[in-house]
Amino acid sequence: MDKENFTRLRGELFCDHPLARYTSWRVGGKAERFYRPADLFDLQDFLTQLPSDEPLTWLGLGSNVLIRDGGIKGTVILTLNRLKELSVVNSQLVFREKSGTEDFFSGNGKTIIRAEAGVTCAKLAKFCVSQGLEDGAFFAGIPGTVGGALAMNAGAFGGETWRTVIGVETMNHQGEILKRTPDEFKIHYRQVEGLENQFFIAGYFCFNHGDPDKAKTAINALLKKRNLSQPIGKYSCGSVFRNPPGDYAARLIESAGLKGKSIGNAEVSEKHANFILNKGNASAADIEALIHYVAQHVSQNHGIQLVKEVHIIGRS
C-alpha cells in the first residue's frame, strides 16, 4: 500500500520508514507505513482510505516509548508539529451540546486552551505563561506532546495533565471526531482507561488567570529544578518506571546499587536512577534487557515490583 492507493493526500507517506530518529532514545526498527499528515483534516482523509483492520500506532515526541528493533506492523502516524493548533477558546462554546457544562465554565478568571495532540508540552507551558496562567507551568517538565500527556495522564513537579482537562477530542479508525468529557474516562496515576480504539487528537485545558510575571518565574524555577536533577540532553525516555505508592522508583533503584549499571550500550543514569540512557549506539534490545534487569533486582532487594511507565511496542 503506497501513495498511489490514496487520493487527496497532502501529507507525506513512506514505506519501510526508519523510526529511531522519531524517538528520544534514538532506537527502534522500521514502520511498514509512516504518515505525516498536513493537518487534522488531512489525517481524516487518510484514515477514511485505510483498511478497517489496519493496525495504527500514534507517535508524538517519542519520549515515552521504546520501539523494538523489529519495527512496527501497520501504519505509524506522526502528530508532532502536524496536529499543531494551539489557541484560547470561548468557554461558552466548549462542549455546549453536553448538558450542564456551560455552567461549570462560566466562572470569572478561567481561561480555556485548546491544544492539538502534536503540540509539545513545553510549547503549551510557554503559551500558558504568555497568557498569565501560572498553574499550567508544570507542563514544561513533561518531555512529550499533548496527545501523549492525555493518553498517560503525564505529570511533573506535582501537576498532572487530567487535573486541568475539561474536555477532549478523540478520533476513531474511520477518521470520525468525537467530543468527550473527563467523566467518560477512568483517570489514574500515569494511566487513562476508556479510549477504546480511539486516539486523542486535542485537549481542552482550564487554567486560572494570574500574573504573567509570576507564571514566567514559576516555569523558570521548574526548569532549573529539572536541569539540576535529570540528565537533560542525553538520549532517554524520561522516567522509565512509575513511582510506587509512598516511595520513588529512583530511590529504590539507587539503593539497589544500580546507578551506572550497563547492558550493551544502555546505562542507568548516574544523575537520576529512573532514567536509562542510550550511550550512543544502544539497541532497543539492550534497553529492554536493562529495564527487566532493574525491575528484577529492585524486586529482589525491596520486595517491590516496579511498574513500567514507558510503553514497549513493536516486534523483537
UniProtKB/Swiss-Prot annotation:
What's an example of a GO molecular-function annotation for this chain? Answer: FAD binding
Q: Provide the disulphide bond pattern.
A: none
Q: State the active site.
A: R190, S239 (proton donor), E309
Q: A single GO CC term, please?
A: cytosol
| Pathway the protein takes part in | Cell wall biogenesis; peptidoglycan biosynthesis
Q: Which gene encodes it?
A: murB
* Entry's localization field: Cytoplasm
Which cofactors, if any, are listed as required?
FAD
Q: Which reaction does it catalyse?
A: UDP-N-acetyl-alpha-D-muramate + NADP(+) = UDP-N-acetyl-3-O-(1-carboxyvinyl)-alpha-D-glucosamine + NADPH + H(+)
Name the HAMAP family on file: MurB
Alphabetically ordered keywords of this record: Cell cycle, Cell division, Cell shape, Cell wall biogenesis/degradation, Cytoplasm, FAD, Flavoprotein, NADP, Oxidoreductase, Peptidoglycan synthesis
Q: Which GO terms describe its biological process?
A: cell division; cell wall organization; peptidoglycan biosynthetic process; regulation of cell shape
Q: Which family does it belong to?
A: Belongs to the MurB family.
Q: What is its EC number?
A: 1.3.1.98
FAD-binding PCMH-type domain sequence ranges: 27-225
Say which domain of life the source belongs to.
Bacteria
Q: Please give the name of this protein.
A: UDP-N-acetylenolpyruvoylglucosamine reductase
Sum up the protein's function in the record's words.
Answer: Cell wall formation.
Keyword check for Repeat: no
